[in-house]
Curated annotation (Swiss-Prot):
NCBIfam families: PRK09891.1. InterPro entries: YmcE_antitoxin (IPR031853). Its main location: membrane. Pfam families: YmcE_antitoxin. One of its GO terms (cellular component) is plasma membrane. It comes from Escherichia coli (strain K12). The chain crosses the membrane at residues 18-38. This is Uncharacterized protein YmcE. It is found in: Cell membrane. Keywords: Cell membrane, Membrane, Transmembrane, Transmembrane helix. The keyword Transmembrane helix applies. It is a single-pass membrane protein.
Length: 76
């Protein structure tokens, strides 16, 4: 079972944006505590500042900051 981590103190980095209702559990793979690979978005990696479930649904609400490609490659 996947664990979804949400932080109480939300710090929004510059350039952060909100994504909601499109992240289905079967399309999201957590590879570290604060990094997601969104398969439905062509495996683009996001640094997650805030992540929580949307009550009563199978979706997530996340505040994301898109990582640069060189940052993504360094994780592998």
């Amino acid at each position: 079972m996947r664990r979804w981590i949400s932080q109480n103190n939300i710090r929004l980095p510059r350039g952060a944006f909100f994504i909601s209702a499109l992240f289905f559990f079967n399309a999201v793979c957590i590879v570290s505590d604060n990094l997601l690979i969104i398969e439905s978005f062509g495996e683009m990696a996001y640094n997650i500042s805030y992540l929580t479930r949307v009550p009563g649904t199978n979706t997530l609400l996340a505040c994301c900051c898109l990582l640069r490609p060189e940052e993504v490659n360094s994780e592998y």
